[in-house]
Amino acid sequence: MSKVAEIRGLEVLDSRGNPTVEVEVVLDDGAVGRAIVPSGASTGAREAVELRDADPRRYLGRGVLRAVQAVNTELCEALLGRDAGDQPEIDTIMIDLDGTPDKRRLGANALLGVSLAVAHAAAMSNGLPLFAYLGGERASLLPVPLINVINGGAHADNALDFQEFMIVPAGAPTFTEAVRASAEVFHTLRAMLKAAGYTTNVGDEGGFAPEFHAAEEALDILVAAIAKAGYRPGEDIALAIDPAASELYVNGSYVYQGEGVERSREEQVAYLVRLADRYPIVSIEDGMAEDDAMGWQLLTRQLGKRCQLVGDDVFCTHPTLLRQGVEQGMANAILVKANQIGTLSEMRETVRVAHGYAYSAVMSHRSGETEDVTIADLAVALRCGQIKTGSMSRADRTAKYNRLLRIERELGSRAEYAGALLRRR
């Protein structure tokens, strides 16, 4: 039993140049674990609260010294001498110490940093990689990447209303081949955009941000890029979209500023159905707003049997919200973001609940990422089968793909690729 001997917090930078929390945990046997917490741009109203300083004299008010102080004082004092191998106890102590339902007193960014760093330290103490420590013998399923190659919405400075357009290499035989195919499509897409006179600068998540005005423009060029790269659209590589509909929802309607169109609930559902009919789309995330329960139910009735419908803002990685959504007939999958809930134990419980209802669980990054690769290990440990971690550029994104490549190599003949599971839907 290795015990927590030291906990240190530090204010560092994320991929957007904003401050975030890094935590280092040292155990009494010398094992060390480190984690850096990401941050989102498009956030759900029911997410756990990240603690910011609100001091305009530092980082335009976005500093995290208060969260770092919570790590170095209250959280450290409460956890010193505790068994690092008892993750549920570690997380329960922190949750009780915070004492708020959304972790606003100490900050979800403080709690999550400690939670993940403890897990890393315990894994090192046991001489195991994190995925094997957390998942045991069943940790052998490599996820299908949902690769965001065209950015819009809150993630880019263009007129596209939808936030993400993704390629999904579900037809690849291995994760390694999935990465290769995706990189080839990414570079083919870059050349096509450049030839057509569009900018090839990239957005927060490493995807391109061309000055398109409608989703169809992005989907058309993606289908063409897949084919030009030598792959079969819908067979080798499919598509996924994230409308981030909560960002479009104004007074009960969906306002598309780029298109200059306003859609009712029924029109929004009909539009998504038309896109799914026309393009090889296998997954739609946040197709309806988090506050539009009737819209979610309608969309699920219309598309749920033939398309993965992922709830992000509507569920916020919370098991209670997920159970409520299942009972109401909303979605058939959940996006899993550790900082939406604030501790590793709660995130694991959410994935357990999802799998219990036969809902898919998609492990996800945030738009403000770091070099931390924990979510790659978590995707394998929890047998999520899918991961969203950005495009084929920017080191904060490719670091996660590189970690998964190493995990696949380490697993050897035990490695499975989850492509068939997604294609079977």
Swiss-Prot record:
State whether keyword Secreted applies: yes
EC number(s) on record?
A: 4.2.1.11
What InterPro entries is this protein classified in?
Enolase, Enolase-like_C_sf, Enolase-like_N, Enolase_C, Enolase_N
Q: Which residues bind Mg(2+)?
A: D242, E285, D312
Catalytic activity from the UniProt record:
(2R)-2-phosphoglycerate = phosphoenolpyruvate + H2O
Which residue ranges run through the membrane? none
The Gene Ontology CC terms held by the record are: cell surface; extracellular region; phosphopyruvate hydratase complex
Q: Which GO terms describe its biological process?
A: glycolytic process
Which cofactors go with this protein? Mg(2+)
| Record: active site | E205, K337
Its annotated pathway reads:
Carbohydrate degradation; glycolysis; pyruvate from D-glyceraldehyde 3-phosphate: step 4/5
Q: Which UniProt keywords apply?
A: Cytoplasm, Glycolysis, Lyase, Magnesium, Metal-binding, Secreted
Q: Where in the cell is it found?
A: Cytoplasm; Secreted; Cell surface
- Pfam families noted in UniProt: Enolase_C (PF00113), Enolase_N (PF03952)
Function of the molecule = Catalyzes the reversible conversion of 2-phosphoglycerate (2-PG) into phosphoenolpyruvate (PEP). It is essential for the degradation of carbohydrates via glycolysis.
Cited PANTHER family: ENOLASE (PTHR11902:SF1)
Name it. Enolase 2
| Phylogenetic classification of the source organism | Bacteria, Pseudomonadati, Pseudomonadota, Betaproteobacteria, Burkholderiales
